[in-house]
A protein has these predicted regions:
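Active-site neighborhood of HAD-like aspartate-dependent phosphohydrolases
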Residues: 2-56
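Anion (oxyanion) recognition and catalysis
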Residues: 27, 84-87, 170
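Short hydrophobic/aromatic-enriched beta-strand-loop microsegments
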Residues: 34, 117-122, 173-181
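Short, acidic loop-to-helix structural element flanking the phosphoryl-transfer center
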Residues: 67-95, 101-107
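Substrate-recognition "cap/lid" segment bordering the active-site pocket of phosphatases
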Residues: 96-170
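Charged phosphate-binding loop/patch that engages nucleotide di/tri-phosphates or the phosphate backbone
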Residues: 194-219
Length: 219
């Protein structure tokens, strides 16, 4: 483990509320009836209360991005405070997202919300492997980057909601802290039963759970 433990935090539906912002965009587009839609039970949004097939959400997502979807997202309650606790608790933090369609919106959002984070994407121009640079050479306490394969970052702990990403992380015996949703309940159970992680509903739980998992990882 690194001298200062390294934590990767996902953005959409982990640190920030994607689903609510997506609903707002759907209403603007003219798709009424989703304001009270439940937490989706499938990551594809092809489930009760949402869409009939897996092809619908990607199309509407692209339209929503054009309407400023990522700029509309808000942190979950207590998430910024938990982030501050982790940063000041000696952890290196990188916000890692797979949203490659955001242009400059993520950068603008972080600036607008007052998160003074370094954009790490420019380091990809170096000859050294990008993931290695982020993992081993980033010494500031907060950074952010685009990263489709979060297992490559080799974090001491990854805070995540995507069931597919969670499975890949756990397949590699990497520690996870799962933001619980209806669509990732099997991963919550897997994390806890395997001893590779825990799950949470409220960000007030995160600092203590993260410290516990990192300490267990160090043993």
């Amino acid at each position: 483990m690194t001298t200062r433990p390294f934590i990767v935090i996902d953005l959409d539906n982990t640190f920030v509320d994607y689903t609510t912002a997506f609903k707002e965009c759907l209403e603007q587009i003219g798709y009424d009836g989703y304001a009270d839609a439940p937490d989706p039970s499938d990551y594809s949004f092809a489930c009760e209360g949402w869409f009939d097939n897996v092809r619908t959400q990607p199309v509407l997502h692209r339209r929503a991005v054009g309407l400023g979807l990522y700029l509309r997202e808000r942190p979950y309650p207590h998430a910024p405070e938990a982030l501050d606790d982790l940063r000041h608790g000696g952890f290196r933090i990188v916000l890692a997202t797979s949203r490659y369609d955001d242009q400059e919106d993520t950068d603008r959002w972080l600036c607008g919300m007052g998160f003074e984070g370094g954009r790490l994407d420019d380091l990809a121009e170096c000859n050294t492997d990008f993931a290695t640079i982020v993992r081993d050479r980033w010494t500031a306490r907060l950074g952010w980057c685009h990263m489709s394969d979060k297992t490559a970052l080799g974090a001491d702990l990854t805070i995540e909601d995507n069931p597919h990403t969670l499975d890949r992380l756990m397949d590699k015996k990497m520690r996870v802290l799962v933001k619980r949703h209806a669509y990732n309940l099997p991963q919550c159970e897997r994390a806890e039963q395997s001893g590779l992680g825990l799950s949470f509903d409220d960000w007030t739980q995160v600092p203590a759970l993260a410290k516990r998992l990192v300490e267990e990882n160090a043993k």
